[in-house]
Amino acid sequence: MWAQLSYTRPESQKTDLTSLFSTDQEQNPLNDYQYQINIRELEEYYNKTILNEDNIQETSSEISSAVSFSPPKNTNAIQPGLLYDPQLMNPFLPSAHLNSTAPTTFKKKLEVQINPDYVPKSSQLPLTSQNLQQLSQQKPKNDASFSSEKESSAQPKVKSQVQETPKQLYKTELCESFTLKGSCPYGSKCQFAHGLGELKVKKSCKNFRTKPCVNWEKLGYCPYGRRCCFKHGDDNDIAVYVKAGTYCNVSSTSKQSDEKRSNGRGSAKKKNLNVKVKALQRMTW
C-alpha cells in the first residue's frame, strides 16, 4: 500500500509576499488613520523623486485613484508589484519588453550635432588653428579698406580747410626762426611766410607815418620795429618815397615845415600836440 507523503516547509523558508501596509491582525493591527498617513507619505515621495514632466499625465490618474480609494478593513496587503516596479521607481530605465536596439536609439537621441560654421557674436574667438588662419586672411583686407577710408575722409577735410581760409589774407613777411634756424615750432599755423613761395608783396599805398615815435625819441629804439605805426628817424626819410615816385603830392609848404623842424630840433624842444599832456608825461617808457 502506498501512503501519501506530506511535506511541510519550515517557517524559515516561507516566502510570503508582504508589503509596507501588510499587518498581522493579532500582533500589529493597522487602523484607517495609520493607513491614510502611509498613503500620504508615499504620495509625497512620488511627487519629490519620481514624477517629472513626461509622466505627470500617466501617474496623476493612478495617484488620484489611490488617494480617493478607501480599501476595506479586511484587506491586509497591497500588490507588491506596484511598490517594487523598477520602471516606476526610475522611469529613465529601459523596459524589459524593448528590443536590444533600444539603448542605441536612446543614445542617438541624446547626441548633439555641432555646427562647424557657427561664429559667435563676440569678437573674441578661441585660439585654434582654423581661427588663426581666418584672422590672418581677414587682416590684409581690413587694412586695405581702413586705409582707403582714411584717405577718403582726409581729402574732404583738406578741401574744407582750403575753402575756409579767406582769399584776402596773405603772408607779407618771412618767418625769422624759419629763415635763421630752418625750422619753426608753429609749423603750418605760423602767420609768417616759410620761404619765398608763400611770400606775397603788399601793394604800395599812400599811407605814410607822419607822427614821430615816442620810444624812438626817448630811448633811441622801439620794440615794435617796422610794425610801429609812428615814424622812426628824421623827416628826411620821406624823401626816399618822393624820389621813388610813390608820393608826389608833397606841397612846398610841407617841405618848408619839415626843414624847419629838422633844423630847430636840436635847439628848441618840440611841442606835444596831444590833448592829454599830463597823462603822457606820467607814462614811463
Swiss-Prot record:
A zinc finger (C3H1-type) spans 169-197, 207-235. Disulfide bonds: none annotated. Residues 37-55 are annotated as: Required for mRNA decay activity. It comes from the Eukaryota. Pfam families: zf-CCCH (PF00642). GO terms for molecular function: mRNA binding; translation repressor activity; zinc ion binding. GO terms for cellular component: cytoplasm; mitochondrion; nucleus; P-body. One of its GO terms (biological process) is negative regulation of cytoplasmic translation. The keyword RNA-binding applies. Gene3D superfamilies: Zinc finger, CCCH-type (4.10.1000.10). Residues 132-164, 252-271 are annotated as: Disordered. Binds to specific AU-rich elements (ARE) in the 3'-untranslated region of target mRNAs and promotes their degradation. In response to iron deficiency, promotes the decay of many mRNAs encoding proteins involved in iron-dependent pathways. Recruits the DHH1 helicase to the SDH4 mRNA and promotes SDH4 mRNA decay. Also destabilizes target mRNA by modulating 3'-end processing, creating extended transcripts that are prone for degradation. This is mRNA decay factor CTH2. It comes from Saccharomyces cerevisiae (strain ATCC 204508 / S288c). The gene is TIS11.
